[in-house]
């Protein structure tokens, strides 16, 4: 009976040692190798960065200062016109609400 207990104890210790050793190896694998999620994240970031750089290059190649100035001028004149007509409309509404004839 003593040999059986010794054999069972030896097997239990062997299984525990293998389990602990397996956990250590799994931790080392996780620490050294990137996970699938991090690999996918890195590839998506690289694709995004390359697409962003390509769009920036295309914008810089097609950028025309004359067109930019025209757009700014059109914006300023249209906002000035809208501001004037909004003021006129506001005055009309206020005069209708106040009842002045």
UniProtKB/Swiss-Prot annotation:
Explain the post-translational modification.
Proapolipoprotein C-II is synthesized as a sialic acid containing glycoprotein which is subsequently desialylated prior to its proteolytic processing.
Q: Where in the cell is it found?
A: Secreted
Q: What is its main location?
A: secreted
Q: Name one GO biological process term.
A: positive regulation of phospholipid catabolic process
Q: Which residues form the signal peptide?
A: 1-22
Which keywords does the record carry?
A: Chylomicron, Glycoprotein, HDL, LDL, Lipid degradation, Lipid metabolism, Lipid transport, Secreted, Sialic acid, Signal, Transport, VLDL
Residues of the region (Lipid binding) are 66-74
GO CC terms? chylomicron; high-density lipoprotein particle; low-density lipoprotein particle; very-low-density lipoprotein particle
Q: Which residues are assigned to the propeptide feature?
A: 23-28
* Molecular function via GO: phospholipase activator activity; phospholipase binding
Q: What does this protein do?
A: Component of chylomicrons, very low-density lipoproteins (VLDL), low-density lipoproteins (LDL), and high-density lipoproteins (HDL) in plasma. Plays an important role in lipoprotein metabolism as an activator of lipoprotein lipase, the enzyme which hydrolyzes the triacylglycerols on chylomicrons and VLDL.
User: Which family does the record claim for this protein?
Assistant: Belongs to the apolipoprotein C2 family.
According to UniProt, the name of this protein is Apolipoprotein C-II
């Amino acid at each position: 009976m003593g040999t059986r207990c010794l054999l069972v104890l030896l097997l239990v210790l062997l299984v525990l040692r293998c389990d602990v050793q397996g956990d250590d190896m799994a931790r080392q694998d996780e620490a050294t190798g990137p996970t699938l999620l991090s690999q996918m994240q890195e590839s998506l970031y690289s694709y995004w960065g390359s697409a962003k750089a390509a769009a920036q290059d295309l914008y810089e190649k097609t950028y025309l200062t004359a067109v930019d100035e025209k757009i700014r001028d059109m914006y300023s004149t249209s906002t000035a016109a809208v501001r004037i007509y909004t003021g006129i409309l506001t005055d009309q509404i206020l005069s209708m609400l106040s009842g002045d004839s």
